[in-house]
Amino acid sequence: MANIGLAFVNPAPLTKPAYVVNFAKKCEAMGVHSMWTIDRVAYDNLDSMILLAAAAGATQRIRIGTSVLLPGLRHPALLAKTIATLDFVSNGRVTIGVGFGSRENDFTAVEIPFDGRGSRAVECVQLMKRLWSEDNVTHKGRFYNVQNLTIGPRPIQKQIPIFTGGSAEAALKRAGTWANGFICGSSAIPEFSVTWEKVARYVRAAGRNPNEIEKAGLTFMAINDDHAKALEALNAYVVRYYGRQRGDVAATSLVGSPAAVAERIEAFLSRGLDTLIIGLADPD
C-alpha cells in the first residue's frame, strides 16, 4: 500500500509559531505516513532541522524528512551530528532527501562555490555515512578533510535512509548507485515508470536490489472548490519559491476541489510510487 507524506513548505511570513507543531500533530492524527520540509538559505523558510526537531517532539509515529536538504551548504561533520541528533530525539524516524542546489544565491550566502556542488554534496553524504557508523574516521577528499574524527551520538537507525532525485542521467545514476530512495519531481510523475526503469538499471549494475529502493514522488497541492482560486494559490507559491512561473505547473500538481484532488492522488499513486509527498501550496 502506498504512503502519503505531507510537506510543510510555508515561508515564515505566512505562518505562525504554533503552525509547525499543529501541522505535525494533525499529520499523526490523520494517519499520514510522514512529514517533510524544504531546505534553503536565501529564502524565508524555517530551518529544516529545527522545524523537524519540533515536529519530532510533538509526535510519536510519523517519519520526518527533508525533500530536499542541501548537504553541500554545510560541513559534513556538523551536519552528520545534527542529523544523528535528530534521529536520536525522534527515536529513529528520520529520512533525508538530498539535493544539489539549483539556486546560486543559497551558495553565495554561505561563501561556498556554486560550481562543483554535485560532487561536493556526494562527498558530504559519503563522509556522513562513515561518521555515523565508524570511529576515528580519516578522510582526504576534494572538498573535505578530517583526521581521526569520531562524533556522537550514533543514529538510532543503523542506516539513516538517504533519498535523492533529479532527471539528468548523472542524477539517475547517483540514485541507483548509493541512495536508499529516489524522489521524482511532479513534472516527471506521469512518466515515472520510464524514469524508474533507468534508475533500476543503475541499481542492478551496482549489485543492489531495486525492490529495496523506495520510490517517492513530490508534488504540490491547493484545494478549493473554486478551481481558479486553487490555481491562484498554487501559482503564487511557485513564483514565491522558485522566483518564476514554471510552465504549466497545474498539469502536474493537485489542484481544485477535494474530489478532484483525491482522484488525481489515486492517478499519481498508480504510477508505481511507494510514497507521494504533497507540499501544501496554500498557507492556510
Residue ranges, per PLM feature:
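Active-site-adjacent structural elements that line small-molecule/cofactor binding pockets in enzymes
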Residues: 1-284
